[in-house]
Amino acid sequence: MAAGALRGLPVAGGGESSESEDDGWEIGYLDRTSQKLKGLLPIEEKKEKFKKAMTIGDVSLVQELLDSGISVDSTFQYGWTPLMYAASVANAELVRVLLDRGANASFEKDKQSILITACSAHGSEELILKCVELLLSRNADPNVACRRLMTPIMYAARDGHTQVVALLVAHGAEVNTQDENGYTALTWAARQGHKNIVLKLLELGANKMLQTKDGKMPSEIAKRNKHHEIFNLLSFTLNPLEGKLQQLTKEDTICKILTTDSDREKDHIFSSYTAFGDLEVFLHGLGLEHMTDLLKERDITLRHLLTMREDEFTKNGITSKDQQKILAALKELQVEEIQFGELSEETKLEISGDEFLNFLLKLNKQCGHLITAVQNVITELPVNSQKITLEWASPRNFTSVCEELVNNVEDLSEEVCKLKDLIQKLQNERENDPTHIQLREEVSTWNSRILKRTAIAVCGFGFLLFICKLTFQRK
């Protein structure tokens, strides 16, 4: 076999190359005619054969050379050990053999651990997962960081390896650790556009509010890299299941993460009913209560539902009619941001009236949705505490949240009233200005009507929350 035929294979030392014949991983002609190596070859020749056997992945020859006296932790050029090289190419069989022969799974070279090397390897996720699992079984530290303060979970999240991320967390990896730039595993997944990783990390307790050194949250990183689906996902309200896996034991978490689809149908760790979660309220408000069981069986959260594509809807058994309702509701939820801070002073004074009116209309519609949601919850609440069959938290928790809601609604009502007074003041000044050309009466009437509706909706929402608060206090 010619030497040039195999030069495309990875080399140790992070892919650095060398034209020197003394390269630690140089691949030359491997003589297979003499494999009875017990003391017949000089030690240097054995080492050379060992390097070449490692490079081409010849497991049987590696074992034979180890039997002949080659050290399993011998270091080659760039200071890499055989185990580090095997991990870098995701050769799970070689990793297993070397570990069984006593190779050090915690070896580091220039702050580069073998576990980090495995998580950033070029190979299929299946092989990388096997290598990581083997290393973790030999007590490799899942939180060891490289020179850039990146941990194994960050590399796995960056490269899109969902199962590897989950396995690392199951063995104690910290989800919210930040690297030298302030990136977390969630930030890396958002940057690279790995939606499944983002969902898994949120489920495992990732904090989506942590900022990078330049003050960017994961959602902003996703938006900057044009991953709009992930941006919407991270911008949406909290997921009822967010962080639930953190409460499980290591064994339960591994079972949850690595089970097959058939196992999930038999063993629902999250099958217990969460009363009036975001998903239930959302579906109830759209008249889609019949979808609740279907979505729960498939472990689909509200966050996931609202970021689905059309093919995902169909794949999960959601009819086209129901799809249209969900998409219409999602469109209504997307209130466009008006970036006043990015506008010049002249532009601020001439901000589009249509945009401002559209903002008020959407705000009013949002208030209407909130009122409907609270009405539905009040309707579904049991009349007395004896009818509550499932375990609830202390009612004090509910009433305290209701009190905060009432306060927030009162604050919102106050701000809307200020806005209304300001607009009324501007309107009066314009009417009294002799140089002003009077607009059609219908426009001012319509604007006033919208503001009145918004104020009424806010006050009505506050009244409903007050009733809800009294209901909880009575119980």
From Swiss-Prot:
Residues 1-25 are annotated as: Disordered. GO terms for cellular component: pi-body. The modification Phosphoserine is found at S17, S18, S20. InterPro entries: Ankyrin_rpt, Ankyrin_rpt-contain_sf, Asz1_SAM, SAM, SAM/pointed_sf. Its main location: cytoplasm. The keyword Repeat applies. ANK repeats lie at residues 45-74, 78-107, 110-144, 148-177, 181-210, 214-243. Residues 272-334 form the SAM domain. Pfam families: Ank (PF00023), Ank_2 (PF12796), SAM_2 (PF07647). The keyword Glycoprotein does not apply. Plays a central role during spermatogenesis by repressing transposable elements and preventing their mobilization, which is essential for the germline integrity. Acts via the piRNA metabolic process, which mediates the repression of transposable elements during meiosis by forming complexes composed of piRNAs and Piwi proteins and governs the methylation and subsequent repression of transposons. Its association with pi-bodies suggests a participation in the primary piRNAs metabolic process. This is Ankyrin repeat, SAM and basic leucine zipper domain-containing protein 1. The lineage of its organism: Eukaryota, Metazoa, Chordata, Craniata, Vertebrata.
